[in-house]
Every structure is written in C-alpha cells, then in structure tokens.
Amino acid sequence: MLCGLAIVGANVATAQNIFGAGTVTCDDWLEYRNQNRKDREYQAQAWIDGFVSGSNLSRPNGPDILTSRTGDEVYAWIDNYCKAKPRDRLVAATWALVKELQSKAK
C-alpha cells in the first residue's frame, strides 16, 4: 500500500511527500507495539530504520548519528515521543529523532 502525505508538524515543515509506514499516527505506532501487532510493528520499524539510515547517509561529511545506537534505543525514543504526541505522524517522530541525534553528534 502506498500512501502520500505532506509532512507538516511541530518538528517537520516541508511540502515533500512520503510513502509507507511513516504516514501512520503515533497512536497507531503505540498500538502496534502494545497490542502484539508484530507484522505492523516490524513494518514501521523497517520504515524508521530506513529513514534514520537514509538521513545519516545523506550527510556523508557530517557526523555519524548512529554511532553507538541500537534499534531498541531508537524505538524507545519513538515510544516516548509518541506517548507525548499521539496525533503526530510517525514521520514527525522520526524526523524529531534525527534532528536530536544530529544535534548531539556535532
């Protein structure tokens, strides 16, 4: 299933479109994690992994934002963001994570 979404949120302000699991809400993400919906959870995790990895690779001369990070740490960060902002899209949570990792890696 391909879905397009203009990214607009507190931490994301762009007219670029995205596809895939990043279009689900944080509330959906938390449901996948808490209701044993592993198929959906793995799909969303793969989307997060790709987004964060792609963001890291898009800055080849910048610091590596994933040094000493595990997937579990990334997903726990997303969990906390989503608990605070359940109506945000997963892309907003993931973008906020990338921005935080970039600021700490400088």
Predicted regions: what is each one?
Residues I7-V8, E41-Y42, W47, V98-K99:
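Aromatic-residue detector
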